Amino acid sequence: MTTVRTRIAPSPTGDPHVGTAYIALFNLCFARQHGGQFILRIEDTDQLRSTRESEQQIFDALRWLGIEWDEGPDVGGPHGPYRQSERGHIYKKYSDELVEQGHAFTCFCTPERLDAVRAEQMARKETPRYDGHCMHLPKDEVQRRVAAGESHVTRMKVPTEGVCVVPDMLRGNVEIPWDRMDMQVLMKADGLPTYFLANVVDDHLMGITHVLRGEEWLPSAPKLIKLYEYFGWEQPQLCYMPLLRNPDKSKLSKRKNPTSITFYERMGYLPQALLNYLGRMGWSMPDEREKFTLAEMIEHFDLSRVSLGGPIFDLEKLSWLNGQWIREQSVEEFAREVQKWALNPEYLMKIAPHVQGRVENFSQIAPLAGFFFSGGVPLDASLFEHKKLDPTQVRQVLQLVLWKLESLRQWEKERITGCIQAVAEHLQLKLRDVMPLMFPAITGHASSVSVLDAMEILGADLSRYRLRQALELLGGASKKETKEWEKIRDAIPG
């Protein structure tokens, strides 16, 4: 019998996401329940955004949760390399094969031409898609232009009529019309593959038998299915998991909920409690119990118990469940976990340089730096009273800063400062006009250690979480204000 092999393939482009852990958990449970193997693969073909630091954070975050893998970049295995950036020659081979067989073609269209074509299609109220301009170029012309160094990509051919039947383990057969599909780029101009080619090639060569991924990928499934057909390969069984959602039913996003695994670690949640909560996202134990271990989930795992209704990621329910785990610990276990969380040597070393020069004895540390060890901070609206700005302007500044920080990819002091500076300058303010608002929002005090250093240490999700708390305290933004301020946000450079 074929060994079940599943995988998770995150992109190392930012903080490790709870959605990644959610999909990893279900892939792990499915594999283990069937006596199979679970593989971790890194999708780092976005060279501008991918970093090894983010990759390591993914490893650390998943391991903190208790998720282990059988093969991967850090543990090796017989199907490596496990980083897509190290497999370029493999993708090139299969891309060329598709072109030779007439299933794909070389496209020289410039971004400007593509934008113009799409604009015309949208003006005619047509679905924007590639118009096939380069699909029938003579072979000698293609060779000549490639040899001359002209920028090009490889696109796959897709049917324009009929439907593709997508066999989904949760929904049964799903029919998707081919006229919704574009002629997908397979190899980019930089010589690296897109998601579609890399996933199909890697899943085949790594012997993946079952693919559990988020349902946001279901509409593009026909492209993957067609690639398997073109290559003549057996297709893995497909399962499209329901998306995690905010309490308002929108897709889970950092704008409405902290999404970073490291945020929950910093907040003092137990890893087994967070994993337990993710396991309850759209799935339930046969006896409906709410608290269970990873081993118990694996033992009873059955995809038929997955609910297609979008599971709500609710911070209050997670906190309640975490409390259940805490209260069932022995006093010794509780003390060990608190010590591990509060006295983490690596974290203390980040804080120490900012505190050491400001205290005369250790008893002064807690009042000065206690905000480093809490989730939210006690807020006093009077701390946001400003000599130069009225209450509406105060809320506007905080909202604009929050929005700019939400778009920040690399959480570093210089970039954080740049975001705040950009907001200040656009509003014709000075940085010193804005910083008095940042101190109470982030630290709970009118003054403290450098708030910019503090934000870098606290991390993106926790800093943004506290800014949201401050905005809520001050009344938030009305719908009218939100629309007006979004226009201002979009005009801010950077």
UniProtKB/Swiss-Prot annotation:
Q: Give the protein's biological function.
A: Catalyzes the attachment of glutamate to tRNA(Glu) in a two-step reaction: glutamate is first activated by ATP to form Glu-AMP and then transferred to the acceptor end of tRNA(Glu).
In Swiss-Prot or TrEMBL terms, this protein is called Glutamate--tRNA ligase
Instruction: Tell me which domain of life the UniProt entry assigns to the organism this sequence originates from.
Output: Bacteria
The record's subcellular location field reads: Cytoplasm
Binding residue positions for ATP: 254
A Pfam family this protein belongs to? Answer: tRNA-synt_1c
A molecular function GO annotation: ATP binding
Query: What does the annotation say about its assembly with partners?
Result: Monomer.
> Which cofactors does it use?
Zn(2+)
Alphabetical UniProt keywords: Aminoacyl-tRNA synthetase, ATP-binding, Cytoplasm, Ligase, Metal-binding, Nucleotide-binding, Protein biosynthesis, Zinc
Q: Where is this motif: 'KMSKS' region?
A: 251-255
Regarding protein family, the annotation reads: Belongs to the class-I aminoacyl-tRNA synthetase family. Glutamate--tRNA ligase type 1 subfamily.
A biological-process GO annotation: glutamyl-tRNA aminoacylation
For this protein, what is the EC number?
Answer: 6.1.1.17
Q: What class does this enzyme belong to in the EC scheme?
A: ligase
**Organism annotation:** Pseudomonas paraeruginosa (strain DSM 24068 / PA7) (Pseudomonas aeruginosa (strain PA7))
Concerning InterPro entries, the annotation shows: aa-tRNA-synth_I_cd-bd, aa-tRNA-synth_I_codon-bd_sub2, aa-tRNA-synth_I_CS, aa_tRNA-synth_I_cd-bd_sf, Glu-tRNA-ligase_bac/mito, Glu/Gln-tRNA-synth, Glu/Gln-tRNA-synth_Ib_cat-dom, GluQ/Sye
Cofactor binding note of this UniProt entry:
Binds 1 zinc ion per subunit.
Q: Where is this motif: 'HIGH' region?
A: 10-20
Chain residues that bind Zn(2+): 107, 109, 134, 136
GO CC terms in record? cytosol
Q: Which reaction does it catalyse?
A: tRNA(Glu) + L-glutamate + ATP = L-glutamyl-tRNA(Glu) + AMP + diphosphate
